[in-house]
Amino acid sequence: MKDRARLGQLLLTGVPGKELDPETAKRFRKLQPGGYILFGRNIESPEQLRKLIDDLRDLSEIEPFITIDQEGGRVSRLRLIGSEPPNAQQLREKADLKLIDEHGRLTGQVLRMFGFNLDLCPVLDLSFDDEADNSLKGRCWGTNPDEVIRNAATFNKAMRREGVLSSGKHFPGYAAAEVDPHHELPVIDKTLEEMEELELRPFRALLPDLDSIMTCHSHYPCWDADRPRWPASLSKNIIGQFLRNQLAYEGLVMTDDLDMGAVLNEVTFEETIEACIEAGNDLAMICHRVELVEKADEVIATLPDPILYDALVRIEKTKKKMASPYPWSIDRFREIDAKIWDLRVKTLGEEQAKILSVEDGKRSPVELY
């Protein structure tokens, strides 16, 4: 059980640059992480990105998750080398499920071309305020549960048909957050009944069709009143008792980025790693402080065997569903990218489509990660 290649499977790590330097390659070869998450800092050109992903796969003894946030709009890492897809709000306001289906299909196709096998979406949070300063602006599929369920399910089904796995986020829902978890810990002071009426409905509806769930960094007194300022991503009550037991979810569960301020400012690194796995997460996500993945691995090695075994089984089961990358073709990439631009024009109109998403300086710069 304490086999190095297996314990590393519980880690989803970022990558420092646009290519694997010798030190990073040595670290990953030794650690054997379960997966890698890429950001704008890793993307320079189509050919470079495919080579980076091929290199990550080549040094892995067990096929890794290769993941990214490719939602649409400002949270579209691939817009650095291609077209920016419309975001969830723009598509929902168009009110055409055929366009959402097309968005899902094209997202799956372009990701598979590069070798990504898991996309960290759909967002299942509701939008209570489209202008809220909580990182969700433009990213939500609806303002009520039924709208989110209808639209997110359409996107999710279409993307998965193309062979790319999905992750519903941000469980159990942080639409009511008044601050951005990238910077500080939101407190969602709602009753469980209120959560069930709104935030939890999309998760309940889509659970059977999601390949994984991402837990969020918000505090919920209705579950953890005895642990003030304890994030949901580390909560046994929310993940172990509610998600695993009450909702009977047996699939893969991962944390959101443990480098966010909502966790960094509240809990030590060692306690964070220990708590997130003991709570019921299978993957601990470390996006930016890549130099700490060895320390995380050491902490994981101290955890009880039954906890590690259950996580490894869920990881292995999910990985069996991963599809292989398409053979690389720059011409095929350009063909898919042209269709993404056409979708943007159909959604926004030709003139509006030319205006790409920008940050207003008040929101979290999630697309720059």
Across the structure, where does each feature detected by a protein language model lie?
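Preference for extracellular/luminal or secreted protein segments
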Residues: 1-34, 236, 246, 264-369
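Second-shell residues forming the walls of enzyme active-site clefts
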Residues: 14, 20, 41-59, 64, ...
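Catalytic domains of carbohydrate-active enzymes, especially glycoside hydrolases
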Residues: 25-39, 106-118
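Second-shell loop/turn segments in exported
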Residues: 40-42, 89-98, 137-144, 299
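Short, flexible, mixed-charge acidic loops at enzyme active sites
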Residues: 76-85, 132, 173
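A generic, well-ordered mixed alpha/beta core segment in the N-terminal half of proteins
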Residues: 83-115
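Short, conserved phosphate-binding/catalytic loop or strand-edge motifs used
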Residues: 124-135
